[in-house]
Amino acid sequence: MPSFDIVSEITLHEVRNAVENANRVLSTRYDFRGVEAVIELNEKNETIKITTESDFQLEQLIEILIGACIKRGIEHSSLDIPAESEHHGKLYSKEIKLKQGIETEMAKKITKLVKDSKIKVQTQIQGEQVRVTGKSRDDLQAVIQLVKGAELGQPFQFNNFRD
């Protein structure tokens, strides 16, 4: 029986490149001359820390980072940007988490979405991925289009196709 896995993964190498590109753009921006502004990637914790002197500049840095991520093929929905910024002395900062893997709640939403569509496939939650098995390839392609079309707030990739 044909099957595939639904996963949510980000290549940390591409994130590193996006952060470096954002820092390069930051160094050439006129409105950030003489301002203490930093974008740092912590690969162990899978977070990006943005620090600057004002809340407005913090929002500008986030826009620069999102633009760099999109250019590197990383969807901005894979960044978990907090609404509130932290204030330490004269610096404002935000710690952006990278969404890796599918959490149990999201996996249940995907499973419910597929079951409600009445497509004749079975879904299994396997850790941080969802396996979809069906009798025909057309059913699996219908599930892929269904999941891509649903706005679930997280980018998904489809891999491990088996016939």
UniProtKB/Swiss-Prot annotation:
Keywords: Nucleotide-binding. It comes from the Bacteria. GO terms for cellular component: cytosol. InterPro entries: DUF520 (IPR007551), UPF0234-like_C (IPR035571), UPF0234_N (IPR035570), YajQ-like_sf (IPR036183). Transmembrane segments: none annotated. The keyword Ion transport does not apply. One of its GO terms (molecular function) is nucleotide binding. Nucleotide-binding protein. NCBIfam families: PRK05412.1. Belongs to the YajQ family. This is Nucleotide-binding protein CGSHiGG_08790. It comes from Haemophilus influenzae (strain PittGG).
